[in-house]
Amino acid sequence: MGRKWANIVAKKTAKDGATSKVYAKFGVEIYAAAKQGEPDPESNSALKFVIERAKQAQVPKHVIDKAIDKAKGGGDETFVQGRYEGFGPNGSMVIAETLTSNVNRTIANIRTIFNKKGGNIGAAGAVSYMFDNTGVIVFKGTDPDHIFEILLDAEVDVRDVTEEEGNIVIYTEATDLHKGIAALKAAGITEFSTTELEMIAQSDVELSPEDLEIFEGLVDALEDDDDVQKVYHNVANL
């Protein structure tokens, strides 16, 4: 499945450091999900899923509650999802997924980042066809064969189940992520460190130290933008 998910998580955690910026981005995502349906996670499955992911990222309860209360109070901001794709040095590719209340601002900011950080923004679909939209589930465990049987019995479309450093890592078809989570919960597995939809590169590249420095600057700048929710790439040594 390309780069190991455990390695991605470790690097992301070290970079994010559970900062206020991460909290703010989850706050926006929670608010948007609450506005699109009922502001009650028990009747809004999309909101429930975002809240579960926020808790996995150790977002404080008061941040979650504030975003829901804002939606309940009739906040009038409307957020739109977007995806921007482009290239870095020597075959490196990057995808930025956004959630914004001002699309024109976001487009301008993303273009500026690519131009200033040594990248080239591409047209829609220029990069994403080289990535697979994948459900990823991670939890503590050491018996991938047993987990695979659970998922197989529940008719979950599974791409792979591995064990990495004491964690079970499951890759599903994107459409079966929630079905996989439900099957695991029915089997008594209720504590997850990751339940995400991710774009995973079909193949990776290794960059030289010089090119890696340029590409890391591009990725960091994209991740630092307030409207960017997720950044995916195909560089194995980042």
Swiss-Prot record:
Keywords: Cytoplasm, DNA-binding, Transcription, Transcription regulation. Transmembrane segments: none annotated. One of its GO terms (biological process) is regulation of DNA-templated transcription. This is Probable transcriptional regulatory protein YeeN. InterPro entries: Integrase-like_N, TACO1_YebC-like_2nd/3rd_dom, TACO1_YebC_N, Transcrip_reg_TACO1-like, Transcrip_reg_TACO1-like_dom3, Transcrip_reg_TACO1_YeeN, YebC-like. It is found in: Cytoplasm. It comes from Salmonella typhi. It comes from the Bacteria. GO terms for cellular component: cytosol. SUPFAM superfamilies: YebC-like. Belongs to the TACO1 family. YeeN subfamily.
